[in-house]
UniProtKB/Swiss-Prot annotation:
This is Small ribosomal subunit protein uS9. Gene3D superfamilies: 3.30.230.10. GO terms for cellular component: cytoplasm; small ribosomal subunit. SUPFAM superfamilies: Ribosomal protein S5 domain 2-like. It comes from Clavibacter michiganensis subsp. michiganensis (strain NCPPB 382).
Length: 161
């Protein structure tokens, strides 16, 4: 019993509360001096995207990014591929988007940016982009209206008597 109490006195000194830093600090990714382009689609929106090495400015249909997408959620959605690859502020984006609403357009722009980044440096970027689901086209589209129904699935009111 005395042996256990002696080891209890020593135990707090031998253990550290600090966890060792397992991960070495990541070196910033090298920006290739290569431009790339791609097309992204989501719902009814189509985005034609061009990436050029630069300061990180995003221009959509000739307008500033924050003006075109005032919603912070849409801005975050579009910037996700850059954040995952540690390339935020490395490429200028010039995009032309047509069709759809704000959410579909943001999704189309995100897919276009991810595909363009994949095209620029496939061997380093593809695995990370694919793992995070940025290279997958979201195939969900609006279901068509059926004859005899008010909407795609909504039936007219039914009365038994």
């Amino acid at each position: 019993m005395a042996q256990i109490s002696d080891s209890l006195d020593v135990a707090p000194e031998s253990f550290s509360t600090e966890t060792p830093n397992e991960e070495a600090p990541k070196a910033p990714r090298a920006v290739l001096n290569v431009s790339g382009g791609a097309v992204g689609r989501r719902k009814q929106a189509i985005a034609r995207v061009r990436l050029v090495p630069g300061s990180g400015s995003i221009t959509v249909n000739g307008r500033e990014f924050a003006d075109y997408f005032p919603n912070k959620l849409h801005q975050q959605l579009v910037n996700d591929p850059f954040k995952v690859l540690d390339l935020l502020g490395s490429y200028d984006v010039v995009a032309r988007i047509s069709g759809g609403g704000p959410s579909g357009q943001a999704g189309a722009l995100r897919l276009g940016i991810a595909r363009a980044l994949n095209e620029i440096d496939e061997e380093n970027n593809r695995a990370v982009l694919k793992k995070n689901g940025f290279l997958s086209r979201d195939a969900r589209v609006k279901e068509r209206k059926k004859a005899g129904l008010k909407k795609a699935r909504k039936a007219p009111q039914f009365s038994k008597r």
